[in-house]
């Protein structure tokens, strides 16, 4: 029963479900029918709308094209506007507002580039022509502004301003010499390390303006115009500065015609001028050039070379004329001074005149240094030969130190003030030997050449005693001078001792030659009695009074003659003079005292003894003290 009821219920539900499905199918069929109807309508609508879509796309593209055209037109119009602005600034000129003027030129270049890349515009050619014409005008004004600005601030430097830049030790003295220190103070170690203050050639505020102008000219391709303007302006000013300082343009012929005193002064000035020119003027010029042409190194070097070449040539040509002039001993020291300054300035010259463009200038400076060194060496060699061959007829009648001796010794002593330079010469241009030994060797040869010449000059004396006195004086002067100078360290003690012995030998020879005869007159030798007997053992009883009187007369005559002659002779050195007098007295006075003691009584016992015994030993000693004083012939005895 229960099962049947469940089956009935289940059957009813199946009927309901079938009815629902059928209804749902009907709805689905209806929906499909409706959707199909919509699809047909939509297809028809799409077909109807297609022409409208095409027209809309075309309109959109047209709008985009219009936008692009408007934007391009705006750019073109802006370029025209910028061109008008640039033209206004260009026509106004760069003088009042250089920065704005340079901006206008930069803008013109951009405008030209723009129209060059957009030549499709109808007006592009006309605009380009106008812009290029405007740019050319702007650059011309720029060039003129550079020229005027550079000229306005380029003035010759007054000497006082240059002197202010020197270290105190190198400034001219306040007595108005103006030409600087003489070359005699030749080598100053402080000069190489002292601080120099560069003169202000162009105000620092102007340099950036000149740099900007130069940069624009380079960018415009006007390097040659720039170079010419800068060279003409600055080279003229530099030469004027040197002329105000005292530098002259002198040819070799001018130098050769000058008197030595005048030339020597000019050489001293030249040394001072070289130091000022290199360390102040050329260094300052390089600094200015590098700042104006910053970023254009090769152009900077070229400009600097062309600005300075004439001034450098003016200075070096004088040095070259001296180096090539006829050699003479007195020129050696100025040649060494000139060589020293060129060596002192070598580092600065290499630094200031850097770069390929300045190569010729550097080579010229190096060439002058070498020529000065070579000429100095040759002059040094000439001096040795000149000393040995000196044939001056200067007579030294009193046997004193010959002018040649004092000249040579002073020359050698002066050389030792330059020994550092001479050693450098031997080191750089010698044969490789030690520079000390080379200097010593040359000095010894000069001294030997002097001795050889003095030997020749001594033969002019007819009196052999004066010959030895002359050689004694001169060699003693050499020895004394060497002992008191740095030459002693170079020549050595052996040289000094050897030549002291030579001095003593000549003193001994003088004494022997001059006083032997009178010593014989004051000896007992040759005194015999009237009977022919000889004097023996100090006994004077057999001596002929007449012969004895003659012997005294002979002594008096000989002494008078010796005194008169030798009191006119000169021994200039006090110590040597006293020692020579003492040496004569030591042999003459004992002999005379002995002779007078033994034979004086015989003469005194006769008539007029004072006629024969003219001198006491004390008289002789006093008169010997008058020897070698260089008295005139008519000067009375004391």
From Swiss-Prot:
The exocyst complex is composed of SEC3, SEC5, SEC6, SEC8, SEC10, EXO70A1 and EXO84B. Interacts with SEC3A and EXO84B. Co-localizes with FPP3/VETH1, FPP2/VETH2 and COG2 in vesicle-like small motile compartments. May interact with COG2. Belongs to the EXO70 family. Residues 163-190 are annotated as: Disordered. It comes from the Eukaryota. Keywords: Cell membrane, Cell wall, Cytoplasm, Cytoskeleton, Exocytosis, Membrane, Secreted, Transport. GO terms for cellular component: cytoplasmic vesicle; cytoskeleton; cytosol; exocyst; extracellular region; phragmoplast; plasma membrane. It comes from Arabidopsis thaliana (Mouse-ear cress). Component of the exocyst complex involved in the docking of exocytic vesicles with fusion sites on the plasma membrane during regulated or polarized secretion. Involved in polarized cell growth and organ morphogenesis. Involved in polarized cell growth and organ morphogenesis. During cytokinesis, involved in cell plate initiation, cell plate maturation and formation of new primary cell wall. Participates in polarized pectin delivery required for the polarized development of the mucilage-producing volcano cells of the seed coat. GO terms for molecular function: phosphatidylinositol-4,5-bisphosphate binding. One of its GO terms (biological process) is xylem development. Its main location: cytoplasm. This is Exocyst complex component EXO70A1. Disruption phenotype: Dwarf and sterile plants with decreased apical dominance. Branched inflorescences due to ectopic initiation of lateral inflorescences instead of flowers. Altered polar growth of root hairs and stigmatic papillae. Reduced cell expansion and aberrant xylem development. Aberrant deposition of xylem secondary cell wall (SCW). It is found in: Cytoplasm, Cytosol; Cytoplasm, Cytoskeleton, Phragmoplast; Cell membrane; Secreted, Cell wall. The gene is EXO70A1.
């Amino acid at each position: 029963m229960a099962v049947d009821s469940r089956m009935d219920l289940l059957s009813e539900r199946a009927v309901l479900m079938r009815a629902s499905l059928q209804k749902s199918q009907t709805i689905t069929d209806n929906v499909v029918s409706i959707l199909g109807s919509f699809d047909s309508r939509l297809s028809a609508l799409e077909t109807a709308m297609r022409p409208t879509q095409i027209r809309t796309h075309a309109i959109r593209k047209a709008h985009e094209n219009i936008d692009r055209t408007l934007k391009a037109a705006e750019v073109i119009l802006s370029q025209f506007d910028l061109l008008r602005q640039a033209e206004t600034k260009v026509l106004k000129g760069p003088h009042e507002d250089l920065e704005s003027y340079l901006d206008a030129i930069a803008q013109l270049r951009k405008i030209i580039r723009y129209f060059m890349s957009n030549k499709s515009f109808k007006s592009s050619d006309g605009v380009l022509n106008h812009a290029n014409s405007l740019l050319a005008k702007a650059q011309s004004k720029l060039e003129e502004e550079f020229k005027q600005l550079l000229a306005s601030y380029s003035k010759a430097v007054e000497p006082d301003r240059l002197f202010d830049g020197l270290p105190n030790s190198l400034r001219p003295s306040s007595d108005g010499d103006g030409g600087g220190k003489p070359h005699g103070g030749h080598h100053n170690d402080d000069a190489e390390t002292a601080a120099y203050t560069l003169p202000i050639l162009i105000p620092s505020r102007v340099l950036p303006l000149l740099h900007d102008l130069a940069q624009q000219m380079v960018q415009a391709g006007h390097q040659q115009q720039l170079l010419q303007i800068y060279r003409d302006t600055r080279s003229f000013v530099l030469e004027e500065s040197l002329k105000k300082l005292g530098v002259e343009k002198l040819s070799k012929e001018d130098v050769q015609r000058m008197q030595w005193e005048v030339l020597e002064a000019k050489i001293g000035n030249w040394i001072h001028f070289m130091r000022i020119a290199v360390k102040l003027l050329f260094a300052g010029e390089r600094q200015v050039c590098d700042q104006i042409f910053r970023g254009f190194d090769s152009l900077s070097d070229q400009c600097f070379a062309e600005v300075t070449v004439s001034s450098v040539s003016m200075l070096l040509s004088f040095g070259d004329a001296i180096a090539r002039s006829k050699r003479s001993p007195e020129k050696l020291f100025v040649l060494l001074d000139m060589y020293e300054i060129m060596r002192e300035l070598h580092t600065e010259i290499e630094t200031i005149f850097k770069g390929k463009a300045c190569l010729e200038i550097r080579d010229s400076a190096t060439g002058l240094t070498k020529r000065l060194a070579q000429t100095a060496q040759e002059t040094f060699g000439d001096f040795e030969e000149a000393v040995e061959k000196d044939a001056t007829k200067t007579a030294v009648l009193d046997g004193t130190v010959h002018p040649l001796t004092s000249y040579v010794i002073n020359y050698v002593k002066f050389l030792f003030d330059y020994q550092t330079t001479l050693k450098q010469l031997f080191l750089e241009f010698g044969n490789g030997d030690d520079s000390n030994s080379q200097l010593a060797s040359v000095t010894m040869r000069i001294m030997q050449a002097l001795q050889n010449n003095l030997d020749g000059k001594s033969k002019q004396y007819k009196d052999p005693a004066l010959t030895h006195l002359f050689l004694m004086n001169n060699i003693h002067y050499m020895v004394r001078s060497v002992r008191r100078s740095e030459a002693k360290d170079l020549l050595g003690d052996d040289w000094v001792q050897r030549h002291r012995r030579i001095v003593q030998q000549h003193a001994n020879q003088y004494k022997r030659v001059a006083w032997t005869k009178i010593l014989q007159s004051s000896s007992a030798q040759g005194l015999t009695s009237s009977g022919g007997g000889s004097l023996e053992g100090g006994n004077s009883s057999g001596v002929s009074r007449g012969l004895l009187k003659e012997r005294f007369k002979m002594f008096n005559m000989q002494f008078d003659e010796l005194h008169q002659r030798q009191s006119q002779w000169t021994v200039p050195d006090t110590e040597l003079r006293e020692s020579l007098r003492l040496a004569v007295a030591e042999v003459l006075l004992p002999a005379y005292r002995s002779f007078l003691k033994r034979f004086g009584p015989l003469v005194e016992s006769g008539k007029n003894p004072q006629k024969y015994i003219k001198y006491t030993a004390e008289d002789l000693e006093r008169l010997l003290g008058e020897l070698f004083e260089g008295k005139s012939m008519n000067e009375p005895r004391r």
